[in-house]
Amino acid sequence: MQKEEDVCPEAGYCLGTALSSWGLHFMEEHSQSTMLMGIGIGVLLTLAFVGLAAFFVYRKVSRFRRAEPIPQYRFRKRDKVMFYGRKIMRKVTTLPHTLVGNTAAPRQRVRKRTKVLSLAKRILRFKKEYPTLQPKEPPPSLLEADLTEFDVKNSHLPSEVLYMLKNVRVLGHFEKPLFLELCKHMVFVQLQEGEHVFQPGEPDISIYVVQDGRLEVCIQDADGTEVVVKEVLPGDSVHSLLSILDVITGHTAPYKTVSARAAVASTVLWLPAAAFQGVFEKYPETLVRVVQIIMVRLQRVTFLALHNYLGLTTELFNPESQAIPLLSVASVAGRAKRQMSYGPEEQLERSPRLSEFNSSDQRSVAVSGPLLKRSCSVPLPPIHGEIDELRQAQGSGSNTSAFQESQEGATSDLGMAYNRARILPHSEEQLGSSLASKSKKSVVAETSAVFHYSEKPRDEPGPSGRTDAIFRAATKDLLTLMKLDDPSLLDGRVAFLHVPAGTIVSKQGDQDVNILFVVSGMLHVYQQKIDSLEDTCLFLTHPGEMVGQLAVLTGEPLMFTIRANRDCSFLSISKAHFYEIMRKRPDVVLGVAHTVVRRMSSFVRQIDFALDWMEVEAGRAIYRQGDKSDCTYIVLSGRLRSVIRKDDGKKRLAGEYGRGDLVGVVEMLTHQARATTVHAVRDSELAKLPAGALTSIKRRYPQVVTRLIHLLGEKILGSLQQGSGTGHQLGFNTASSKWDLGNPPGNLSTVAAMPVSEDVPLTAFALELQHALSAIGPVLLLTSDNIKQRLGSAALDSIHEYRLSSWLGQQEDIHRIVLYQADSTLTPWTQRCIRQADCILIVGLGDQEPALGELEQMLESTAVRAQKQLILLHKEEGPAPSRTVEWLNMRSWCSGHLHLCCPRRVFSKRSLPKLVEMYTRIFQRPPDRHSDFSRLARILTGNAIALVLGGGGARGCAQVGILRALAECGIPVDIIGGTSIGAFMGALFAEERSYSQIRIRAKQWAEDMTSMVKTILDLTYPITSMFSGTGFNSSISNIFKDRQIEDLWLPYFAITTDITASAMRVHTDGALWRYVRASMSLSGYMPPLCDPKDGHLLMDGGYINNLPADVARSMGAKVVIAIDVGSRDETDLTNYGDALSGWWLLWKRWNPLATKVKVLNMAEIQTRLAYVCCVRQLEMVKNSDYCEYLRPPIDSYRTLDFGKFDEICEVGYQHGPAGFDIWVRSGVLEKMLQDQQGTSKRMDCGVFTCPNSSFTDLAEIVSRIEPAKVAAVDDESDYQTEYEEELPAIPKETYADFQSTGIELDSDSECEPSMSQGPHSLTSPKQSQDSFPWLPNQDDQGPRLYRPS
């Protein structure tokens, strides 16, 4: 029995095992049939359930149909009105209780209702529709050039007249009758292929314009080979303005090395230069204007191209002496020698020195020498006396009578010459009265060792008499050089100066220049090298030669420095006095201009045939994509836009070019077809350098090749540093990339402001902006009233259009930026403002409805190519900006916008005189660099300062402290952006205007992040991420509410990683909280955010660019301050060989006696892989020259240490001042606040012909070309060597400013000479009087002695 009991369990176990194995086997064999059976059962159950549901629904519907119909009652109208009336009254009665809160019941009811609504929203998942910026294509006028070229057929003038007018730049300055008088002399010439137009040896007396066919201009080298420097196509011309000047001055010369021949059968228009002489005989004043234009062309076109861009200096000037024999001085000197032999008591050892004058406190000083037995009392003049009188006679910006007196002259040729030279013509009586009181004194000594003499001769013996005789003799020789036969023209207008060795007579860049005529000694002319601070000697001015006449004729700044390396005496004629002489005798310019031409080298004469000076109308294409690259262009004035056409036919803005930029140089040097189409944004003036001329220059001066290589390399490097790879370059201040705009406008010359409506305080806005711009450089504000005061009431008439354009171009030359204030209606002045503007500011009031104004509708209907920016003004105490999207959506022509918080005075209702009086006081104070107007000024001039905040979790709390330190250090922020936590902190900074509010809101969010309850409630099943993101979304949306990025005070951007397109995204529009949340979406913790625009998935921007300084740079920032708070990876890892065992790692980790190893786990490896691109980008940013990198010591804090907010914030605040102090000591802060254009148009300092572009400046630093040695230096080496040995003991850098010594100073004034009166810093920008025409004249500046440190 026991045995059976033992067997049964075993049998049962065996049976169970067999059944289970059989079941498994059956399931394996019939798995497919089992699945089909299950599906069938499920379908049957579903059909049964649907049938039952249909049955019950049918029963209910049938019962409803069988029920009796209920009668429908109709409300009477009176009952309906009473019903709704009672309902409204019930609402009204409960409203006061809700507002005042007399009882707790209404409040409790409101709270309950709010909770129910929020619960319903969560359950039903209602999504709020945020306003979005509508993507629009740019207007055709922005990216497309006019298809119509120079139209000859539709013009009422003959084609030959149009061709001549279009090509010969000087002819455009003639009035219509004068031009038609010249056209009478034109002759048609038919040429066969190979036939020469002119050859070497023939007289150079003609202007040729090709009507059809093609000419070749050749230059013969020293070895006899001919080089084609220019191909002349129909409509182009062959002429040299220097040759025209030779004909006018009566010094005709033959062609020496230049020839022209017909490449194909051609028809040429021939105009003899002698035709100009007949016109000048009838209209003498026109002579002055034409000579001035030729001189301007020489300085602005020829010297700009050859010196600034090709690095040539001594090669441009003729070192040989051009002096005339000083016969009169020699005869006087001979008599003086005979008189000196009579006795030593009549000898004067040297002229009075500055120390002798400084040692006296009286109005007279005894001038004595060791050999002088008798002393004479010499009255000292006031330093500022007569220069004040001269400036008062010339008129200031506020002198209306001076404007009225000069209205008639301002529109004449002589008046235009005065305007270019920045001299207001005054009447003969004014000049005579100002000089009448000066004729009584004999010898006047000034602190700069300058002697002035009266017209009446002195007969008394002694040193004064002999010096007076030398002065009169030198004046006679000067009359001979200037070809004047009336000595009275120089009476009271010439000063005789003696300067000691080492004196700098005039500095490079001086505006007020004198004509100097050397009598004894020698003046050395130096020019600063473009790649260093060293000077190179251009030529020597010997006795009998002039210097400084080119700057006087053109009104441009002086191109070189004039220095006396040994004692020197010379005559000086101020610019104002020379123009007075010229007003009486216009032909005086011929002799003076001829001295300039003689100083030019033969090389300049050759290149003058190849260089073209052209004017392009707005909308005209300079060249088109795919054209042959046969020349390069230099922008003299105006603005050009480069557009590239993609393969799909779409056009993209590649860049813009302003004054001084090189255009098309890359394609020309690489011999490639044009890569883009370039057209004129507004009427522009260009210099054209043909490729053949460049080839000839390279053969003659090989060092130019090195410079061209650097130009090409720096151009490519500059485009890379602009961040072209980001794909989000912008045009103004926002990376919305609505039109994918190109280079930011750091080189704007003109800005126009126009109102949306008449309610806009445009005058106050313009004055505020002018005040802010004055901190950057000289600025000029022009209004219609201002123009009528300056140029006369008829200045805006069409007949004076060219003269007005010329005058406005001169203002661009001498000012950093010109601000045009348009009228509120479409007047001729408003049209002129739009036509002249590089950028148009459309000014509106932020609290008004975003309706279109009258002027805006006109902008939309006309093809205005200048970029338009929307400026919204807000009151200080008013609400924050809102509804910006509506403003932008209604204005498709706006490429950007800015919000300005204006002081109360902007909106004050004051009359114009009171407004001017108020701003007169305001202009006495420096502008606030933290104001919104200063921010606008920096953005317009390309000096914006950007702040970029990196990602790093809780370590980003240190950025709050750094923001406080920035404000205390006085560093303004114009653009802000960031990644991850940096995007959050940057958004707070862009929205709030006070640090305390930023800290409060940031701390509130940090406390939410430390809430454990909210974190647990946000957990979800980790398929995509550990958290659902609901709680995180609510924490961010509670901070920013419904704020849009467009409504922020500062231009702002956030960086995200688009994992759909595998690219970086830059967000500058849309819901603020949404893109801040997207930028903080860490992989694995938060799900990607779906972009409502295109549905792309957005993740944390730190994976691709954790410190986006390059993006801020592409938005137009000059300097980027980058705050890095990212974690630093461990780099000291264990080298474990070729294989790694996880068991070995486990043993090392658990064994307390084993040596610890540093090996990454899988999560760390994945994290480092994700941040590989970010680390590379960070290294590029840290090594860039535009970025100032700052990293606080926050490595000890972890990513989620939000509970230590105060501690981390304090670390940032303590570290900020330490870093900023280093910036102050090293000069970084000063450089940060300076204008980016080093050669800006300063009235007091610095050279300005045309400022170079940024890449050219870099090339000038890199390229060091050894100058070719010239004969002038070799000739002087015999005596210069021993003289240079004595120079250290001499104040070599003494700079005597003689710019206003051409007028005798009144000896009766009681002002005493004082060193404190004289010096004015040459490096500090001075507010130009023209920049604020209504202010009183404060430009009082007399003779001074300048000693640089």
From Swiss-Prot:
Compartments reported by the entry: Endoplasmic reticulum membrane; Lipid droplet
Domain PNPLA: residue ranges: 947-1113
Summary of the tissues where the protein is detected: Expressed in the brain, liver, kidney, lung and testis.
Signal peptide: none
Cytoplasmic side: 58-1349
Binding site for a nucleoside 3',5'-cyclic phosphate 2: 496-599
Record's keyword terms, sorted: Endoplasmic reticulum, Hydrolase, Lipid degradation, Lipid droplet, Lipid metabolism, Membrane, Phosphoprotein, Repeat, Transmembrane, Transmembrane helix
InterPro entries: Acyl_Trfase/lysoPLipase, cNMP-bd_dom, cNMP-bd_dom_sf, NTE, NTE1_P-loop_dom, PNPLA_dom, RmlC-like_jellyroll
Residue positions, PTM Phosphoserine: S341, S377, S1277
Residue stretches of biased makeup (Polar residues): 1314-1331
Cellular component per GO, a single term: lipid droplet
Region of interest called Involved in the binding to lipid droplets, as start-end residue ranges on this chain: 678-964
Membrane topology: Single-pass type III membrane protein
Family from the record: Belongs to the NTE family.
Function in brief: Lysophospholipase which preferentially deacylates unsaturated lysophosphatidylcholine (C18:1), generating glycerophosphocholine. Also can deacylate, to a lesser extent, lysophosphatidylethanolamine (C18:1), lysophosphatidyl-L-serine (C18:1) and lysophosphatidic acid (C16:0).
Domain notes: The 3 cNMP binding domains are required for localization to the endoplasmic reticulum. The cNMP binding domain 3 is involved in the binding to lipid droplets.
Name by which UniProt lists this protein: Patatin-like phospholipase domain-containing protein 7
Organism encoding this protein: Rattus norvegicus (Rat)
